[in-house]
Regions:
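Short beta-strand segments of immunoglobulin-like
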Residues: 194-203
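Accessory beta-strand-rich segments of carbohydrate-active enzymes
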Residues: 39-42, 81-192, 217
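Active-site region of glycoside hydrolase catalytic domains
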Residues: 186, 196-197, 209
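Bacterial N-terminal signal peptides
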Residues: 11-21
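Beta-strand-rich binding/interaction modules
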Residues: 115, 203-220
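Accessory carbohydrate-binding/adhesion or oligomerization-edge regions at the termini
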Residues: 25-70, 144-150, 154, 164, ...
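Bacterial N-terminal signal peptides that target proteins for export
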Residues: 2-13
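Surface-exposed, low-complexity/disordered Ser/Thr/Gly/Pro/Asn-rich loops and linkers
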Residues: 69-78
Length: 220
């Protein structure tokens, strides 16, 4: 994987045209993976849920803190903290010369993504996005995506206290991204890969700097 940074200045008048040409050249397709997933909390039998999803929609709001062992009970209304797994199987036909990434907007508190039983990446923190390249993990036909999410308290992950509960779940949108071999980098903190900074501003003129991260698979 090769990463290059391109930087240039443009006037406000030409900004839309320049950005339009960049995004057209990127030629990426985004396929939402929201919707029906199989979900299992703490080893319990799987059920169908709709992602984005949290398993604390009711128990975190009723004020029942409960011990963790109580939260393992099916009939308990205690605030549940622990591991859960989201599973989804989907047909994918990887195209030659294309690259594939999976991006999640947020999972609380830590998460691990696997594709066809092979690890794609892990993330800590409930409020930031994650993105991994999964090109070498995909196969033609049926592919199984697994997202392990755990909202167990961890002393090294903030926040530890607040006037809110730490909801567990895959609670923001998740998507599959297809790009060319050379693309605007989706892996830099799962950001858009395009950064715009105002350099000067007056009543008659505005100048901005556009920095773009390009990611190459090394074949181009």
């Amino acid at each position: 994987m090769n990463i290059r940074i391109h930087s240039f200045n443009v006037s406000c008048v030409g900004l839309c045209c320049v950005l339009g040409s960049f995004f057209a050249a990127d030629a990426r397709e985004v396929y939402p993976l929201n919707g029906s997933w199989d979900f299992s909390f703490n080893g319990k039998p799987a059920e169908k849920v709709t992602v984005p999803h949290t398993w604390n929609a009711e128990d975190a709001a009723n004020g029942a803190q409960g011990k963790r062992e109580d939260a393992k009970s099916v009939n308990s209304d205690a605030y549940r903290r622990g591991p859960a797994v989201y599973l989804r199987t989907l047909p994918v036909e990887p195209r030659p010369g294309k690259r594939y990434f999976i991006r999640g907007g947020g999972a609380s508190i830590v998460s691990e993504v696997s594709v066809n039983g092979k690890p794609a990446g892990s993330h800590e923190g409930a409020f930031t996005a994650f993105c991994y390249e999964i090109t070498p993990l995909l196969k033609k036909g049926s592919n199984t995506i697994s997202v392990l999410v755990d909202n167990t308290q961890r002393n090294h992950i903030a926040p530890q206290r607040g006037d809110f509960s730490m909801f567990g779940g895959l609670y923001r949108p998740i998507e599959l991204i297809e790009t060319d071999g050379v693309c605007i980098d989706p892996l830099f903190y799962a950001s858009p890969g395009v950064f715009i900074t105002t350099k000067s501003l007056s009543k008659s003129k505005a100048e901005v700097e556009v920095k773009t991260l390009l990611n190459s698979d090394g074949k181009a």
